[in-house]
């Protein structure tokens, strides 16, 4: 055979070295299509003979070589979609090779296909066995979202949850930037945040790469913890309100605990200028069945630890001008409800967020006014020497004077039916002094008003005397508040 033949799908015949058709007769298989070995015969003619002296036919083999192929490789990139996918291939010809092995997949990962040459074909290395070729499906991009980006934890709500939504099955983890302020735990796709102490923290939520998704970028949730401290004065009024509304005040503080406030502004002609005074706790959930639950009752106030009453320049003077009087005329008609003290001095005709000008309510700091809650107080609201049960009715007040029974726990000059709807405050029940001093002269005791009208006279209200005893005085006197 002269030269080589390679399979091309067509019939082919070899050319021959030393072949002379005048001397030799060509026979046997002289053409072929498929790759393989064939046998031709050569027989000397007439006077010709082989070099060995014979004239019989000689068999000569000749071949058609298998066509050479390149092993296929994955042509396209595949990314997880949730459905079955198959790759396309470089150098794949179904006429030349058989595709087997794993030819489709759903999950991200690596798979193995096989390619086996068909008849007439071989690999570039000359082999004809099956070749294993790896192909892959890449992970889809991961995603992560949180149902909350901020959380506020309080005494009333010490835990909260964050729901995590992520693609796939990547493990969810969470960390706190300040675990002593807010701790975290993870169960499934829910992150639970638990308050530990007052402060702020950032919760970082992560999702690891899963079976079919890459790890997404982290997400964060800010946490503000306003848990109270046990020192009342260290807490904001907003925090105190949260604790109060949860009915948890007694869990953190005690009757008598103090928080400082600053009074500023004119109150019916008397001006407070940056007066620091302590409001102290009278009781928790005081008389709640009548007055409303989940409230902390305070009294103003103390300077340092000395009990004081607010006194204007008209203190202990009788008159009709503006001042800290129960009424500007000498009467208790209308009782507590209609009194000048309740409506004008304290400002109960308005609300703390819209205070009456020149009232004590308006002089309170705005952060306190923002969280003040009304209480329902029962008092003789008729006056005029009344002493009947029907005259004891309710008012809704933000600022109020104490009633005789609330201070003393007994009745000496108030309407005898007031006490049926009242309770003595725990502060005074504990035996604390009822003596109050002038806020501007803290060594000088003063008498201070109570809201109870005197039952046996039309001109008087009850008050606490300078020695702490119960007494009554003309409604138009200016006294301590």
Kindly give the residue locations of the regions a language model identified.
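Solvent-exposed beta-strand/loop surfaces, strongest in extracytoplasmic domains of secreted
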Residues: 1-226
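Collagenous Gly-X-Y triple-helix signature in extracellular proteins
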Residues: 228-481
């Amino acid at each position: 055979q002269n030269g080589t033949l390679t399979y091309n799908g067509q019939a082919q015949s070899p050319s021959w070295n030393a072949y002379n058709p005048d001397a030799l007769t060509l026979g046997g298989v002289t053409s072929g299509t498929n790759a393989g070995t064939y046998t031709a015969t050569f027989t000397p003619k007439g006077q010709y003979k082989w070099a060995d002296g014979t004239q019989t036919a000689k068999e000569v083999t000749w071949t058609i070589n298998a066509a050479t192929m390149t092993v296929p490789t994955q042509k396209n990139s595949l990314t997880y979609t949730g459905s079955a996918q198959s790759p396309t291939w470089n150098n794949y010809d179904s006429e030349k090779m058989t595709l087997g092995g794993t030819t489709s997949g759903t999950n991200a990962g690596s798979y193995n296909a096989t390619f086996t040459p068909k008849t007439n074909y071989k690999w570039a290395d000359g082999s004809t066995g099956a070749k294993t070729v790896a192909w892959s499906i890449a992970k889809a991009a991961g995603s992560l979202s949180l149902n909350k980006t901020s959380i506020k934890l309080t005494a009333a709500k010490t835990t909260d949850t964050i729901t995590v939504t992520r693609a796939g099955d990547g493990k969810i983890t969470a960390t706190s930037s300040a675990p002593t302020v807010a701790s975290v735990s993870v169960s499934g796709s829910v992150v639970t945040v638990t308050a530990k102490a007052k402060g702020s923290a950032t919760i970082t939520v992560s999702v690891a790469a899963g079976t079919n998704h890459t790890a997404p970028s982290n997400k964060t949730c800010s946490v503000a913890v306003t848990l109270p401290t046990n020192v009342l004065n260290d807490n904001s009024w907003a925090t105190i309100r949260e604790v109060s509304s949860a009915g948890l005040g007694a869990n953190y503080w005690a009757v008598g605990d103090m928080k400082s406030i600053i009074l500023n502004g004119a109150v019916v002609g008397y001006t407070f200028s940056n007066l620091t005074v302590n409001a102290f706790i009278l009781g928790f959930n005081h008389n709640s069945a009548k007055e409303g639950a989940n409230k902390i009752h305070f009294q103003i106030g103390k300077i340092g630890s000395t009990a004081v009453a607010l006194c204007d320049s008209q203190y202990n003077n009788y008159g009709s001008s503006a001042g800290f009087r129960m009424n500007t005329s000498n009467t208790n008609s209308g009782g507590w409800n209609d009194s000048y003290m309740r409506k004008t001095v304290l400002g109960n005709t308005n609300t703390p967020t819209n205070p009456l000008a020149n009232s004590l309510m308006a002089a309170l700091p705005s952060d306190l006014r923002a969280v003040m809650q009304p209480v329902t107080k029962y008092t003789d609201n008729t006056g005029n020497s009344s002493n009947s049960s029907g005259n004891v009715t309710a008012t809704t007040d933000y600022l109020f004077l104490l009633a005789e029974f609330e201070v003393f726990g007994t009745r000496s000059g108030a309407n005898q039916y007031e006490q049926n709807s009242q309770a003595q405050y725990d502060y005074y029940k504990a035996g604390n002094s009822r003596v109050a001093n002038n806020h501007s002269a803290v060594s000088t005791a003063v008498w201070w008003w109570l809201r109870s009208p005197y039952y046996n006279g039309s001109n008087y209200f009850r008050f606490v005397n300078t020695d702490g005893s119960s007494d009554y005085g003309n409604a138009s006197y200016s006294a301590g508040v």
